[in-house]
Amino acid sequence: MIPRIRQSQRDLIDVSNITDANSLLIYNTDEDCYNYYSKTEQEWQSLCGKLGKADFTIEDCSRIRVNGVYQNNVALTSANYLTIPVNVTKVGSYSIQVVPNPANGYYFSTSGEFLSTGTFEITVPGSGTPVNYTPTGSDGDEIKITLNGIDLDCSNKPKIKIEDTTKRPRFAISCNSVTVHGVYKKGIATTTANKITMRLNVYDGSQGATYSVKTDMIDGLSFSGSGVLGAAGTQEIVLYAEGTPYSTSSKLFTITTNSESTTATCQALVVPVISKKKIMAAGSTTYGLTSGGENGCDAMIKNIMNYGDNENSIIKYEGFASVETSSSLSDLATWVGGTQPYDIIVITYNLTPNDAQRALLVDYVNKGGVLIYLDQNNSGTDGTRNVQLVGEIFGESIDRPVDIASTCNYVIKMNPGVDDEISNGPFGDVRNGQWGEDYNNSCGLPVVPRGAIVYAGAINASTGLASTSGAQATILRHPTKNFFWCGDSGLIHGGTSTSNTTTPFQIGSRTFNGVTYPKYPVDKQAYGNQAAANRLPVCNSTLFANVMAWAIKMAEESGINSGK
């Protein structure tokens, strides 16, 4: 008689003498299969296959997903399947069967081999035709799960609702009611807080029918919801998120339904939170990225309603709480080098890079680094170096800075012909506005580099006339590299001053759709050195808020550390 033993008992058999052990035969009760010892392989082999049966389980049955619509007297198709997460601790063959309990004319089944251990999601296709629909008040068919012939005992198993085919789902979807809720982070599993709410318009005669509404899957994330249609009229429903986002890119989902009266779809945009970036703010703290205290740029960028992981944050980002500062460029080689260089470098007053530093910055930008360069030096060696950096990033030679002086009355017209995420971005549209010079010593470029996106030339916004200085550009960026330049080191100089010729950066409280943003960028009013009646609002803070949103996005998607 062939001995029937467990695998642990089999492994205690002395097989050190492979000649004597060769061809030993046992029945492995764990695998439910015959095993024999092979002298050639010097290991136990299974007659059920070289790998034998796998050891695996479902650790959380609540994560089993039921896909598709199920109707009585309607055969299952390829759209009807289960997605089951399993944890494999031993490679080998597997079989999975899922049946309704009690039986109802359909089932799910699959088999195969696990070639490595770890966690996997298995798709288990359905077959058959449901016989009985789910009665009113019931959650659906209970299921029994069998893994390699052994019934699995687990709680929180999903139930499968079978629609009554005599009740037809006829309804329309209201796209303007679609609202995305929750915070989405790369690598973090979604919870019940992650959902989409929307309204249905239920038609007469559909009460009691089952609705099914879902999205496509993008980057590991999808939404779905189902339920029973109520009386004719408006009905709010919830689509809960499933899965874990595996990228920070924005995701535009298409919402589809099982309505028999329309094939219309809606869309829902999900914007995941971008991870924190290494940021260096170089220059005077009076004029730089962290200037202005509670009334300036520092407060604007660090407020989580502007840039944060709040559900209502304008930019979904882990925040600027850890911005580093430096009053010199002496450590620039360290900032741009190594295995983890700074993602974003912001240079303001009064730090014009020397020749060696310029070469480092050009290389940094060419490798994907984000450089925001605000420099008003317009004469002498530093003036030349200022515009040389711009030229070299564009692959051109520019060595003559232009002094704007007071030729624009401190208010320079924005370019209305440029429409992108900086000129018309998440914090507002500045295309028909003007930016304010901080004092009257801005630098302009004598030429526009090839391909440059010019946000502002040198047109006096109060008169509509071009500056007599001959400047052609005062604010621009590169079309493909992560580089932004402004010829005024005080572009983001802010605070509580009411001066009409300095501190053009201002923030205030704004409320949108019932949500308050206490440190929001706002125009500074009545700016410029012209007659009081002709002074204008300036958009410095809105412009720069959009610039920082662009910088974060570029650092994430095409930055120097992207993909690391």
Give, region by region, the residue ranges found by the protein language model.
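Extracellular ligand-binding/catalytic regions of CAZymes and related secreted enzymes
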Residues: 481-484, 488-564
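Short, solvent-exposed loop/linker segments at beta-strand-coil boundaries, enriched for Pro/Gly
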Residues: 100-115, 215-229, 261-263
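Short, surface-exposed terminal/edge motifs of secreted or surface/virion proteins that either
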Residues: 25-50, 371-373
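Extracellular/surface-exposed low-complexity repeats and stalk/linker segments enriched in Gly/Pro
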Residues: 1-27
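Aromatic-Pro/Gly-enriched surface loop or interdomain linker
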Residues: 272-344
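Short, surface-exposed loop/turn segments at beta-strand-coil junctions that are enriched for proline
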Residues: 127-135, 242-248
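A glycine-rich, often tryptophan-bearing local segment used as a flexible ligand/cofactor-contacting loop or short
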Residues: 351-439
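Catalytic beta-strand/loop cores that center a nucleophilic Ser/Cys/Thr
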Residues: 405-510
